[in-house]
């Protein structure tokens, strides 16, 4: 681990928390009709869901930063770096959509980031196979979560739906890549604990 790498990751963390993340791909555009006018209730609900998704991407940045820094092999480091770059697109897309919905990111983002960073360090300390397994399970749970949001978002909110759908596609790819790279299946108690922690985060971030 070199100083340049630490500085680079520190910069990425600051960008994650300050809302100035760079996107390498444009914001996904709806394939069908543009947004119809959302009712105030629909707009509030969509904003809450997109705030949850934004928090998830803040956590993803912290997780993959920590896992990259603690990875043993160059191949694992490269995989975490690639996933982090695509997740940074997600971070920028969800921030963009929150602004369009006249809303804001979670007020607790520094807390979410710090917690995810600690979890990523712990996963990385257990070795690459466990760390990659943690990545695969994380992506599976995120995929399920995003599928739920697709059913909850207003049908007329085509902008949010386009973003969430592309995020889901990317998460599936990340999870498969982690499994193919040798990630092991986590034990049931670990998977259940991850779901419980995710439930606390999503329930809180919807409002705060």
Curated annotation (Swiss-Prot):
- According to its UniProt record, in which pathway does this protein act? Cofactor biosynthesis; ubiquinone biosynthesis
Tell me what reaction this enzyme catalyses. Answer: a 5-methoxy-2-methyl-3-(all-trans-polyprenyl)benzene-1,4-diol + AH2 + O2 = a 3-demethylubiquinol + A + H2O
Q: Does the keyword Hydrolase apply?
A: no
Among SUPFAM superfamilies, the record links this protein to: Ferritin-like (SSF47240)
InterPro entries in the record: COQ7_proteobact (IPR047809), Ferritin-like (IPR012347), Ferritin-like_SF (IPR009078), Ubq_synth_Coq7 (IPR011566)
Q: Name one GO molecular function term.
A: metal ion binding
Location relative to the cell: Cell membrane
Q: How does it sit in the membrane?
A: Peripheral membrane protein
Chief subcellular site?
A: membrane
Look up the record and name the cofactor or cofactors this protein needs: Fe cation
Q: What keywords appear on the UniProt entry? A: Cell membrane, Iron, Membrane, Metal-binding, Monooxygenase, Oxidoreductase, Ubiquinone biosynthesis
The entry's free-text remark on the cofactor is: Binds 2 iron ions per subunit.
Cellular component, GO, one term = plasma membrane
Where does the chain bind Fe cation 2? 87, 139, 171, 174
The enzyme's E.C. designation: 1.14.99.60
Instruction: Give the enzyme's main class according to its UniProt record, as a single word.
Output: oxidoreductase
- Family per UniProt? Belongs to the COQ7 family.
Q: What does this protein do?
A: Catalyzes the hydroxylation of 2-nonaprenyl-3-methyl-6-methoxy-1,4-benzoquinol during ubiquinone biosynthesis.
This one is known as 3-demethoxyubiquinol 3-hydroxylase
